[in-house]
Amino acid sequence: MEINHDYRVKLFDELGFERKQCTECNQWFWTLDKDRTTCGDSPCDEYSFIGSPITRKKYTYNEMVREFTNFFAEKGHSPVKRSPVVAKRWRDDILLTIASIAVFQPWVTNGLVKPVKNPLVIAQPCIRLNDIDNVGRTGRHLTCFTMGAHHAFNSKDDYKYWTDKTVEYCFELMNRLGIDGKTITFIESWWEGGGNAGPCYEVITHGVELATLVFMQYKKVGSEYEEIPLKIVDTGYGIERFAWASQGTPTVYESLFSEVIEKLKEDAGIPGVDEKIMAESATLAGLMDIENVGDLRVLRQKVAEKIGMDVDELDKLISPLEYIYAIADHTRCLSFMFGDGIVPSNVKEGYLARLVLRKTLRYMEKIGISMSIKDIISMQLENMKEIYPELSEMKEYIMDVLDSEEKKYIQTVNRGRGIVERMAASKSEITLDDLIELYDSNGLPPEIVKDVVDELNKKGKKTIAITVPDNFYTIVAERHEEEKPEEVVSTKKELPEVEVSETELLFFKHPTQVEFEAKVLKTVEKYVVLDKTLFYAEGGGQKYDIGQINGIEVIDVQKKNGIVFHKVSDISKFKEGDIVKGTVNWENRLKLMRNHTATHVINAAATRVLGKHIWQTGSNVDTEKGRLDITHYERISREQVKEIERIANEIVLSKMPVNSTFMDRNDAEQKYGFTIYQGGVVPGDTLRIIEIEGTDVEACGGTHCSNTSEIGYIKVLKTERIQDGVERLEYSTGMGSVSEIAVLEDTLIDSAEILGIPNDQLPKTVKRFFEEWKEQKKTIEELQKKVGELVKYELADKFEKYGNYEVLVEQVSGTPNELMSIADNLAVGNKLIVLMNENDYLLCKRGENVELSMKELIRNIGKGGGKDNLAQGKYSENKEQITEKIIQILNK
C-alpha cells in the first residue's frame, strides 16, 4: 500500500508552526522560528544548552521522573510500575528491555491481550548495549537509560487519541518545564521495529533530541505495509537527557552521577579539566559517534583542532575522565541487571551482564581506581533508593555476585597470558575474529590481549599485528543481544495435520477423575483424536499420561494447536464417530502430580535459601524423578542443599493447599509479578495459575496435588553444574524417596561392613584411610624420585652422539611416573631422552638446548601428543627400529 502521511497537526496550525527543509541534512521539520534554516539536531546544530540550562529550574533525575509521570497523570494517564530490565521474564524473542513498548509486546501490541491501563504513563529503565563503546566518549550515550512514555492503544471500540493530542502533550510538557517554544523543532521521520512501522516526530531543542513520538499503525510484510487494527501511540522521552538539559552540565554523566564521578576522580587522582576545554570538547562531542566514524582518534583530532590543542595532550587529559564516565554509567547498568536478577554466565543475558562488568573492571584497572566495584555500586543503589527501593532489597545478592565475578575475572586474566602466547606463536596477526574468540571462549578483554602482544613484539623474534577496534564491545554485544531460538532436536515423529475443534481438557475441572467418555473425531496414523480427554499431553516439562481407551493401551499423548493426539497400540480398533471410554493410569498420574508439585516447592525453597535472583531455566517431571534447572552464580553447597531439602519438606508437612485458578493475564501479572513465568512464557490472555498458599505462584498447565502433604517426602538426590550460571537439582518424592534412601543406606552399611566398623565410624575411618593413603602416595613419589636419581647413573654411559645431540633410547621397567622421574634427572643441555616400559608406554623429553619438538618426534616413532619439550604416548616397534627412526630424523 502507498503511504502518504500528513505530518501537519492541530497544534502546528493553531500556533503558526512552519514546515521547512534543513539546509544541512535535507530533513523536513516544523518550527515556530521563522528564521531557522536547520533542523536543530546535531550535527546540523551544536549543543547550545551546555553552561546555559534551558528549563525554569534544574532537575535531578529523580525529580524529572516525578515531573514527567505527574504531568501525564494529570492528563488522564494511569501510572504503571516499571517492568524488569530482563525482557526474558515475559517474552522469548529479546533478552533485555530496550524500550517502553517492549513491556507491552507481543501480547498487547498484537491485540491478544488488553493493556493493563489505557492510556498509561510509565518511566521504564531500558538497556541497550549497541552503543556501549560510545559511552563516556560522546557525552550523551548511556547503556542504561529511562524511557518516559505515554501510550494509548486505539481500537475501533476504544479510541483514545492520536497525533494531535500526542504533539500537544509534548509541547505543553516542554513549555511547563520552561523550554522556549521557538527552540523546539519536530522533525518528520519514520520508525520501524519488531515488524511494525509508522510515522514519527523527533523532538529536538538546542541540538539534542529529547523525545520521539511514534504512531504505530502498520505491519511490514516483505517490502509492503499493511494497516493493523490497533493504532498505538508509542512515545519515548529521554528522562536523563531532560535532566541534563535542565542542568546544562558538560555531559549527561555529571547531571546523573556527580557524586560518583567526584569520588572516582579523587580515588584515581585525576585532576580537574579546564572548564573552557571541557565545555568546548563536550559541545563538539555531540558530533562524535563511534559507530559512524569508527575511529576514536579521528574524532579526537576534530576536537583538538577546534580548541587548538595537541591531540596527544588532549587524549591524555580527557581519556581518564571518559573512563570514569563509563564506569559511572556501567555500574548503574549493573545495578539494574543484577537487581532484576540476572546471573552472570557465558550465554544470553548472563553473557551481556558479564560483558558490562568485565569492561568496567578493566577500566578501573586502567586508571588505577583502588576502591572496589562493590563500593561504587553501593553508592549507585543508595542514590536510586528513592525511586527504585527494590534494587536495594537485592543488595546482598548483588554484593555476593560481584565478589564471585571479580574472582573469576582475576583468574581469567592470570591464565590469559599463556592463552594469548600460544595463539600468537602460530600467527602473524591477531584478527578481530581472534579477539572475539578470545573474549567469547576465554573471557579475555581485547585490551589485555593487546598488552600481551605488545610485550611479545618488544622481545620477540617476529612482529605480530593487532588492532583493537574502538567499537569492539559494541560488535560483541550485538552478536549476543538478540535472543536466538534454540535448536531443539526432537526424537518424536511430527504430529499430523487435522481439521477438528480443540480438545476439551477435562483434567483441569476434574483433576482426580480417572474415567471418561468421549467421541472419536479423527483417527490418523497411530493417533486417536477425541472431542475431550482426561489424558495429560506432554508439555511444560511434564511427561504424558498413560492408560487405556476401550481397553487399548495409550502409549503416548501429545498436543498440537490445542488438539490432543492419543497414540494407541492398535489403531484398527477405532473409527470416527465412536463413543469410547478412557481410563487414566492413576498410579502413574499420581507420581507425576507429586513430582510436578514438588518442582514448585523446591523452586520456592531454593529461592529462600539462595536468593530472589534464581530463575527456572528448565524442568523435567517424570514418574520416578524430577529435575529442576535454576540460575545461580556459584555451585550449590552441601549445606545449602540440606537447607533446601529441609524447607521443602517443611512445606510438605505444613499441608499447604495447592489452588488452581484461571486469571486474566494482566490481573495475574499485577497481583503476582513476572515470577509467574518461572516455568516459561505462556501465550494467551488467560493464564492457569497454580498457587501453593504462602509459598509459590506460577502460570502452569500441569497436573498437581491438591495439598502439599500429598507429595510425600522430598529427597534432593544430587546437584550439578550443567552450564555456566545454571545449577540442576535432581529429586524424588514419596515412595521414590524411600527407595533412594534405601539405596544410600545399603551403600553405607556395605561400606562399613567391608571396613569392619560400625556405621557411625565410617566418615572418621574413611578420612583416616585417606590421610594414610596420601602419606603413602607422597612416600612412593619420593622413592620414585630416588629411583630416578639412581637409574640416572646406570644410564649415564648409554647415551649415543647423533649430530649435535646426545640421545638415549632405552627400555626401562617402571610406571609412567617412574619413567618421568628418570627423564627429569637426565634431560638437561643437549640431551634427548626416549624411554619405554613393558606396557607400551613411550616418553620423549628434551634438554633446554634441543630444538627438536618432542610432540613432532613422538608422532614419528609412535602415537601420542604433548608439548615441544615433553610428549607421551604408545609405541609398537622395538627399540632398534625406534632408534633408527630417530637417527633419520636428526640427520635430515
UniProtKB/Swiss-Prot annotation:
It comes from the Archaea. Its EC number is 6.1.1.7. It catalyses: tRNA(Ala) + L-alanine + ATP = L-alanyl-tRNA(Ala) + AMP + diphosphate. Keywords: Aminoacyl-tRNA synthetase, ATP-binding, Cytoplasm, Ligase, Metal-binding, Nucleotide-binding, Protein biosynthesis, RNA-binding, tRNA-binding, Zinc. PROSITE patterns: AA_TRNA_LIGASE_II_ALA (PS50860). One of its GO terms (molecular function) is zinc ion binding. InterPro entries: aa-tRNA-synth_II/BPL/LPL, Ala-tRNA-lgiase_IIc, Ala-tRNA-ligase_IIc_anticod-bd, Ala-tRNA-synth_IIc_core, Ala-tRNA-synth_IIc_N, Ala-tRNA_lgiase_arc, Ala-tRNA_ligase, DHHA1_dom. Disulfide bonds: none annotated. SUPFAM superfamilies: Class II aaRS and biotin synthetases (SSF55681), Putative anticodon-binding domain of alanyl-tRNA synthetase (AlaRS) (SSF101353), ThrRS/AlaRS common domain (SSF55186), Translation proteins (SSF50447). Its main location: cytoplasm. It is found in: Cytoplasm. Its cofactor is Zn(2+). GO terms for cellular component: cytoplasm. One of its GO terms (biological process) is alanyl-tRNA aminoacylation. It holds the Pfam family tRNA-synt_2c. Binds 1 zinc ion per subunit. Zn(2+) binds at H596, H600, C700, H704. Belongs to the class-II aminoacyl-tRNA synthetase family. Consists of three domains; the N-terminal catalytic domain, the editing domain and the C-terminal C-Ala domain. The editing domain removes incorrectly charged amino acids, while the C-Ala domain, along with tRNA(Ala), serves as a bridge to cooperatively bring together the editing and aminoacylation centers thus stimulating deacylation of misacylated tRNAs. Catalyzes the attachment of alanine to tRNA(Ala) in a two-step reaction: alanine is first activated by ATP to form Ala-AMP and then transferred to the acceptor end of tRNA(Ala). Also edits incorrectly charged Ser-tRNA(Ala) and Gly-tRNA(Ala) via its editing domain. This is Alanine--tRNA ligase. It comes from Methanococcus maripaludis (strain C7 / ATCC BAA-1331).
